[in-house]
Amino acid sequence: MNIQQALNHITKNIHLTQPQMEEIMRSIMQGEATEAQIGALMMGLRMKGESIDEMTAAARVMREFAIKIDVSDIKHLVDIVGTGGDGQNLFNVSTASSFVIAAAGATIAKHGNRGVSSKSGSSDLLEQAGIHLDLDMQQTERCIREMGVGFLFAPNHHKAMKYAAGPRRELGIRSIFNLLGPLTNPAGVKRFVIGVFSDELCRPIAEVMKQLGAEHVMVVHSKDGLDEISLAAPTTIAELKDGEITEWTLNPEDVGIESQTLNGLVVADATASLKLIKDALSKNKSDIGEKAANMIALNAGAGIYVAGITKTYAQAVAFAQDIIYGGQALEKMSVLAEFTKTLKQSQAD
């Protein structure tokens, strides 16, 4: 099936099969599809609604084309990642949570990009923190193995995605490519916390991850519209564990955290995001820092739990709070910045 035939199917509201979608995705990754065709595909799938088979097939092909890092032998290897597109411009919760999860004894291989629809993507924030992302594959692997936390800058690993970059930028809508980012970690990760931009995606994304061989996954979307676990509202969760998917709703009070509004947690840019995160992870916090710390604990707890460090989510949230208030997460951030600086200097010598 060529992309024109696929578009014809999609306009009739017909889902593509996995083999059909794999063929279309390969044509995009090999530079055979025009930008107009890619843009039309993005819009058509968005209007129709991406099926589980379409997402699974596209993710499988994208993984096939990825430049990989093999750290799959590491125990407790996890990624915490969001689709973006919640439009609320909160501080970068998942990136802050990464340092807490790593300080808890899990290993983070975080797959991220610059902000597409938000003001602070993970890469924007990390660069502000002095963490170098322009590392080669061996250096990134060293960060993961030696520091317990490494960041996989998506364009370095998914070079074939350059063909979709123009349409994504020009259309400015969330699309199947926003969904694929969290599904295509190039480090062989099988444990994930994935935030999605609609609660209707929670179960389907869990189903996709099951087909892709994941072991333990929490797919989350909060009732106030966040692609993460919210401090201000219940969060819908689809959890894949031991091959089974269960759906449940989480209230912060369920794990001993008082619900609060998100006032004060919105940031203008990566600089403001970093300032708030450093406040939240420090031992002496402002009132807004305390609130941000609670938000981080809810999300870091999910990562600690799916990584297999604790048996329950509630235990993991309590552990995350201990780490945040003990200052270990902030220390992990500064140590990683220093380590990447050393790697870059040795590269230059």
Swiss-Prot record:
Its EC number is 2.4.2.18. Keywords: Amino-acid biosynthesis, Aromatic amino acid biosynthesis, Glycosyltransferase, Magnesium, Metal-binding, Transferase, Tryptophan biosynthesis. One of its GO terms (molecular function) is magnesium ion binding. The keyword Metal-binding applies. Mg(2+) 2 binds at D227, E228. It is an enzyme of class 2 (transferase). GO terms for cellular component: cytosol. Pathway: Amino-acid biosynthesis; L-tryptophan biosynthesis; L-tryptophan from chorismate: step 2/5. Anthranilate 2 binds at R168. Its cofactor is Mg(2+). Belongs to the anthranilate phosphoribosyltransferase family. HAMAP family: TrpD. This is Anthranilate phosphoribosyltransferase. The lineage of its organism: Bacteria, Pseudomonadati, Pseudomonadota, Gammaproteobacteria, Moraxellales. The gene is trpD.
